[in-house]
Regions:
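Alpha-helical packing segments of well-folded alpha/beta enzyme cores
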Residues: 81-88, 137
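Solvent-exposed, charged/polar functional surfaces in cytosolic regulatory/catalytic domains
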Residues: 87, 91-95, 140
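The C-terminal cap of the DNA-recognition helix in HTH/winged-HTH DNA-binding domains
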Residues: 97-98, 143
Length: 152
C-alpha cells in the first residue's frame, strides 16, 4: 500500500492518505468547502499551489533546519529553498491584500492547507515580517473559534 502519514481510516477497511485529500473528504458538505463552481476550483487551485509551489520549499527548508540541525551536507539544499519559498510567500501576500481569506469571505480548507507550513515558516529561515498580509491572515486564522494549535 501507500504507507504515508497522515492517514484517515474510513469505515473498517478503507484508508485515505494525503493531507489535502483528507481535508477535502472531511470538509465535504461544510462551509469550509464551497459546494461547486469557481470558488470550489479556487480552493483546489490554492491546495495545488501549496503542494507544488509552497511545501517543497518551506517545509523542506524547515525540516533541514529544525529536525536535522542544518548539517553542512544539506546547507546548499537549504539555501536553495529560500528563493522558491519567498516567491510562494510573495504570491500569497499579494493575493491576501484586501482579503481576509484565500477564497471568498470565510475560511476554507485552502486556508487550512496554507496555514500548516506558513505559520512555522520561520523555522525554515523565512522572515515573515516582510509579508504583513500573511501575518494578519495568520492571526485571523488563529483567532477563529475552535482553533487548535499544532502539537509539538
Amino acid at each position: 500500500g501507500n504507507e504515508k502519514i497522515p492517514v484517515l481510516q474510513v469505515g473498517e477497511s478503507e484508508f485515505l492518505v494525503e493531507s489535502n485529500a483528507i481535508l477535502n473528504f472531511l470538509a465535504e458538505g461544510s462551509a469550509l468547502l464551497p459546494g461547486s463552481g469557481l470558488d470550489r476550483a479556487k480552493v483546489l487551485q490554492w491546495q495545488f499551489f501549496e503542494q507544488y509551489s509552497h511545501e517543497p520549499y518551506i517545509a523542506v527548508a524547515r525540516f533541514i533546519n529544525k529536525y536535522l540541525g542544518l548539517p553542512e551536507s544539506r546547507k546548499e539544499e537549504y539555501l536553495s529553498k529560500q528563493e522558491g519559498g519567498n516567491r510562494a510567500l510573495s504570491v500569497m501576500d499579494s493575493h491576501l491584500a484586501g482579503r481576509d481569506y484565500f477564497v471568498g469571505d470565510s475560511p476554507t480548507i485552502a486556508d487550512i492547507s496554507l496555514y500548516a507550513y506558513t505559520h512555522v515558516a520561520h523555522e525554515g529561515g523565512f522572515d515573515l515580517s516582510g509579508y504583513q498580509n500573511i501575518v494578519r491572515w495568520l492571526r485571523r486564522i488563529e483567532s477563529l473559534p475552535g482553533y487548535c494549535g499544532m502539537t509539538p
